[in-house]
């Protein structure tokens, strides 16, 4: 006999923050009658998704990976950015066994040390201070051929802001006496996560063969040429940088290749192209045998030395639900599927017992401002069907629109994205009401509420440190102030009448009135 469930749904509106300033605030200017009604009718508040509250440095904007780890684990999780920066400050980084072994092996055979990653102060996928520490460490250990393959940001940073980073690293290599920037390319190509292998192949060919659309003798010159082609940092075409003799750097057998991104989701595809013998995403002209090291763990099936393996998180929400015989569903589009599964489960790839997953393909468009509704209608169709099936105790759903369209910097499109999500929420709430379910609406971090940089006047494409909404569509209740993302999992267990495990240090925010 099938037991009928009265589900609790957690709707994560990605990139949807609250900002007092209404100028170029897509969340404010969007027509959102559903959320307006829910805020008027139900208990609601604001919670924190950034800085120390999510295990990041004070003031650091939140991001989707960090947000979902905190949401799912029910505790503040010390993030890789903080962890690695601390290791550098404590001089532990320069003794890291995985990094030292790769550098030493290359030095011993006269090989090169190639360092690749997002050259950015953004702190979301990487930090340029970590890349600098790696360059310094390689030279200190005797490497004379150090090649930096710089992926440019413009998404978690202003759209045209890479010049200062490139200039700094040119100066750094001059000071060190060895090394140089060997290539630049936008993250749009090197860090795709949606199986657009034609993009990744351009980064692969650039790093392995020095094969590129453009060639320059200086990285800043290459960047300025890209700007003259109207390419912002994120979209800079593959550009090889030649040495004094006009030669490009290539990846050879025995070289070290160290990937300095600490966030997994946009690091996986290009990593697999380098290390997977059965890789078939695109035809590889060369497959050099290199000592490949990842800064953190990108996926269980990526077999490479890891400089900083993940902490093992036990008793996350998913695991607690499994252990108590509860059923759960995770559902999102491609762009945020890893977040409601891998990251929400504390870095575990395999589903828990009783955990179903539904993946909706994100639309195949160059940038999501071209289709701001993304696949939200199809996602909601599946979500409503799952609610009405009464199979699940807990449903975790992410709507990517606010974040993915917010990143384009297109204000009008971001407004449309918010309006599309609002309409979907209306359908979800209606379906939950039919089966006696309840729902929490929140976000992982801000983005769409600030679409222009008030200082520079450029489009603001990055996340924010704003508070995010927290709405309880259910029984009459009060909501505590001062909450944070790590309070959400304990809140869900509390609403279910379940005890909260000791590992969850977050506190229930919702108190139902008797």
Curated annotation (Swiss-Prot):
Pathway: Carbohydrate degradation; glycolysis; pyruvate from D-glyceraldehyde 3-phosphate: step 3/5. It comes from the Bacteria. The keyword Metal-binding applies. Keywords: Glycolysis, Isomerase, Manganese, Metal-binding. Its EC number is 5.4.2.12. Mn(2+) 2 binds at residues 14, 64, 444-445. Substrate binds at residues 125, 155-156, 187, 193, 263-266, 336. The keyword Ligase does not apply. It is an enzyme of class 5 (isomerase). Pfam families: iPGM_N, Metalloenzyme. The active site is at 64 (phosphoserine intermediate). SUPFAM superfamilies: 2,3-Bisphosphoglycerate-independent phosphoglycerate mutase, substrate-binding domain, Alkaline phosphatase-like. One of its GO terms (cellular component) is cytosol. Its cofactor is Mn(2+). Mn(2+) 1 binds at residues 403, 407, 463. GO terms for biological process: carbohydrate metabolic process; glucose catabolic process; glycolytic process. InterPro entries: Alkaline_phosphatase_core_sf (IPR017850), BPG-indep_PGM_N (IPR011258), Metalloenzyme (IPR006124), PGAM_B_sf (IPR036646), Pgm_bpd_ind (IPR005995). It catalyses: (2R)-2-phosphoglycerate = (2R)-3-phosphoglycerate. GO terms for molecular function: manganese ion binding; phosphoglycerate mutase activity. Belongs to the BPG-independent phosphoglycerate mutase family. Monomer. NCBIfam families: pgm_bpd_ind, PRK05434.1-5. Catalyzes the interconversion of 2-phosphoglycerate and 3-phosphoglycerate. HAMAP family: GpmI. This is 2,3-bisphosphoglycerate-independent phosphoglycerate mutase. It comes from Shewanella oneidensis (strain ATCC 700550 / JCM 31522 / CIP 106686 / LMG 19005 / NCIMB 14063 / MR-1).
């Amino acid at each position: 006999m099938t037991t009928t469930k009265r589900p609790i749904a957690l709707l994560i509106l990605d990139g949807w923050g609250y900002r007092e300033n209404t100028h170029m605030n897509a969340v404010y200017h969007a027509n959102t009658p559903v959320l307006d009604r829910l805020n008027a009718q139900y208990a609601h508040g604001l919670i924190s998704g950034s800085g120390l509250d999510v295990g990041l440095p004070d003031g650091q904007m939140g991001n989707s990976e960090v947000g979902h780890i905190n949401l799912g684990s029910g505790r503040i999780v010390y993030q890789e950015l903080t962890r690695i920066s601390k290791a550098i400050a404590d001089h532990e980084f320069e003794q890291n066994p995985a990094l030292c072994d790769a550098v030493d092996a290359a030095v011993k055979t006269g090989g090169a040390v190639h360092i690749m990653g997002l050259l950015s102060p953004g702190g979301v996928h990487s930090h340029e201070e970590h890349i600098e520490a790696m360059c310094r460490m390689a030279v200190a250990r005797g490497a004379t051929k150090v090649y930096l393959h710089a992926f440019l940001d413009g998404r978690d940073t202003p759209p045209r802001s890479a010049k200062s980073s490139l200039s700094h690293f040119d100066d750094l290599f001059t000071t060190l006496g060895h090394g140089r920037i060997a290539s630049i390319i936008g993250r749009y190509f090197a860090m795709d996560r949606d199986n657009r292998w034609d993009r990744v192949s351009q980064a692969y060919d650039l790093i392995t063969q020095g094969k590129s659309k453009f060639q320059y003798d200086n990285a800043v010159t290459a960047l300025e040429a890209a700007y003259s082609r109207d390419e912002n940092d994120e979209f800079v075409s593959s550009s090889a940088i030649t040495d004094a003799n006009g030669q490009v750097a290539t990846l050879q057998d025995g070289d070290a290749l160290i990937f300095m991104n600490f966030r997994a989701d946009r690091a996986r595809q290009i990593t697999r192209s380098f290390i997977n013998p059965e890789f078939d995403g695109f035809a590889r002209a060369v497959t050099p045998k290199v000592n490949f090291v990842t800064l953190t763990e990108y996926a269980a099936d990526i077999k490479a030395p890891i400089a900083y393996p993940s902490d093992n998180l036990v008793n996350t929400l998913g695991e607690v639900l499994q252990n108590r015989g509860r059923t759960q569903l995770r559902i999102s589009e491609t762009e945020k599927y890893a977040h409601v599964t891998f990251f929400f489960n504390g870095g575990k790839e395999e589903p828990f017992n009783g955990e179903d997953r539904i993946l909706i393909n994100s639309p195949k468009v160059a940038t999501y401002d071209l289709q701001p509704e993304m696949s939200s209608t199809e996602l909601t169709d599946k979500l409503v069907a799952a609610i009405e099936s009464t199979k699940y105790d807990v449903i975790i759903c992410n709507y990517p629109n606010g974040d993915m369209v917010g990143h384009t910097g297109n204000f009008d499109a971001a407004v449309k994205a918010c309006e599309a999500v609002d309409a979907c929420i209306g359908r979800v709430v209606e379906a939950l009401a039919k089966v006696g379910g309840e729902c929490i609406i929140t976000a992982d971090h801000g983005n769409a509420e600030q679409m222009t940089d008030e200082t520079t006047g450029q489009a603001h494409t990055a996340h924010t440190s704003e508070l995010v909404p927290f709405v309880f569509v259910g029984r009459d209740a009060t909501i505590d102030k001062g909450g944070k993302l790590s309070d959400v999992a304990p809140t869900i267990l509390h609403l279910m009448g379940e005890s909260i495990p000791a590992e969850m240090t977050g506190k229930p925010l919702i108190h139902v009135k008797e």
